[in-house]
Regions:
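Beta-strand-enriched cores of mature, soluble protein domains
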Residues: 1-124
Length: 124
């Protein structure tokens, strides 16, 4: 089996909304204000007001991602995207979440399990 990337994805994030400590860790809502994706078979934008991460940082400092978004392809199809995963919450991530820095590609690691759904026959 040969794995090939479907796309590269970027998101413009709002400052997190702190929900606070709960039984699973420190929960926050990180809203996505646009972004995009591009690859050999899929390209387009992230619909504004349709995406967020319900992030939890546990007592070990591991971030647990729960992201949902609506993608709009370059040819007008809508795709629901959801992924769960884990995020290494290092100094770069902490600074970005605090609004005092950026975390660029390659400055942390995260592992996700994506799922996508659409009713558009071109992308089933």
């Amino acid at each position: 089996m040969k794995l090939e990337p479907l796309m590269e994805y970027y998101a413009n994030l709002e400052p997190p909304l702190a929900i606070g400590d709960g039984p699973f860790g420190n929960r926050m809502l990180v809203e996505v204000k646009g972004g995009g994706f591009e690859g050999p078979r899929l390209k387009g934008k992230i619909r504004e007001l349709s995406a967020a991460d319900w992030l939890i940082i546990d007592s070990d400092g591991v971030g647990h991602l729960d992201v949902r978004a609506t993608f709009e392809t370059h040819d007008g199809a809508y795709i629901y995207a959801q992924y769960y995963g884990t995020l290494v919450v290092n100094e770069k991530v902490q600074a970005a979440l605090a609004g005092s820095g950026d975390c660029d590609y390659g400055e942390t690691e995260f592992f996700i399990t994506p799922r996508m759904e659409t009713g558009d026959e071109r992308y089933k």
